[in-house]
Amino acid sequence: MHELSIAHNIVTIASDAAAEAGVDRISAVHLRIGALAGVVADALRFSFAIAAEGTPLAGAELIIEEVPVVVFCPDCNAEVTLTNPRLFRCPRCDRPCGQIVHGRELELVALETP
């Protein structure tokens, strides 16, 4: 379960940011996670709660925005959201698309304080 190491990294980054800002506690952490990031959101939430114990993030809420897979279709000359991220085919014209625009994100977007 690599989600635990990801959770530890999130806690480290957020704790460092809190210390730098002179904040004693973080109440929420906002993440963006792409469908292709290979992260199971529920496992990350569970791991985050464990990793946050005894830190300024203890009890903080982990808010995850799931990012769909978006590819660029050269035939349609457009960015399209894939309905099935396992098939890299344009849902408009059914042509193969390999240029991923979104979907691999794993970003810490914001921290909230009480």
Swiss-Prot record:
Q: Which InterPro entries match?
A: Hydgase_Ni_incorp_HypA/HybF_CS, HypA/HybF
Q: Which GO terms describe its biological process?
A: protein maturation; protein modification process
What's a single GO MF annotation on this record? nickel cation binding
- The answer on whether this UniProt entry bears the keyword Zinc reads yes
Say yes or no: keyword DNA-binding present. Answer: no
User: What residues does Ni(2+) bind to?
Assistant: 2
Keywords, A to Z, come to: Metal-binding, Nickel, Zinc
Q: Which Gene3D superfamilies match?
A: 3.30.2320.80
Residues reported to bind Zn(2+): 73, 76, 90, 93
Functional note: Involved in the maturation of [NiFe] hydrogenases. Required for nickel insertion into the metal center of the hydrogenase.
Q: Can you tell me which family this protein belongs to?
A: Belongs to the HypA/HybF family.
Q: Which HAMAP family match?
A: HypA_HybF (MF_00213)
Descriptive protein name: Hydrogenase maturation factor HypA
List the source organism.
Answer: Chloroflexus aurantiacus (strain ATCC 29366 / DSM 635 / J-10-fl)
Protein's gene: hypA
